[in-house]
Regions:
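Canonical tetratricopeptide repeat
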Residues: 84, 118, 152-156
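Start-of-helix register in tetratricopeptide repeats
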Residues: 46, 80, 97, 114, ...
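Terminal, low-structured helical/coil segments at or just beyond the last alpha-helical repeat
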Residues: 3, 41-42, 133-166
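Structural marker of alpha-solenoid helical repeat scaffolds
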Residues: 74, 108, 141-145
């Protein structure tokens, strides 16, 4: 499925993979939450799952960000860690940091569907619509039939288009 998908990899990075049918698309009403991509938590160690709980259940992005900074320092080859720190940074509107974190994760796993999707949402937040469309095209190539990451980005693009009369 495009090479990611819980494949292990160095440092236990795994990928977000073709999550086919795993739950909803996140909890915050705008299809933007790690729940949809991570409800199965494939490729995540116990520590990362605990941090994910901070994000999903408590929406404690600041607390999660502090823990994720330590986590990625100790696990620099874990693309899932970079994805979550990018997500938490984006939710805190730290867009420059978020972009750096997503790019770092993609250097580790260029086919990480979760990062590609979230990076596309970051592009929308920073008014880079064309870049978001490019990420959607990449997901089109990578994703299987029921790809939550692709659906989430497509929905975010649709909302962006409606809000900006595109």
């Amino acid at each position: 499925s495009g090479g990611s998908g819980g494949s292990g990899g160095s440092g236990g990075s795994g990928g977000s993979g073709g999550s086919g049918g795993s739950g909803g698309s996140g909890g915050s009403g705008n299809n933007d939450g790690p729940g949809g991509n991570y409800s199965y938590t494939s490729g995540m160690d116990k520590e990362l799952k605990q941090i994910l709980f901070e994000i999903e259940k408590k929406e404690n992005y600041e607390g999660a960000l502090k823990k994720l900074e330590v986590y990625v320092y100790e696990n620099p080859q874990n693309a899932n860690g970079w994805n979550l720190i990018g997500f938490a940074s984006r939710k805190l509107e730290q867009y420059d940091n978020s972009e750096i974190y997503y790019n770092t994760g993609l250097e580790i796993d260029p086919n990480h569907e979760g990062i590609i999707s979230y990076q596309g949402e970051l592009y929308l937040k920073t008014n880079r619509y064309e870049d978001a469309l490019e990420n959607l095209a990449v997901l089109d190539e990578l994703c299987n039939f029921n790809c939550i990451e692709k659906k989430a980005l497509a929905e975010a693009i649709k909302v962006y288009e409606e809000e900006n009369s595109l």
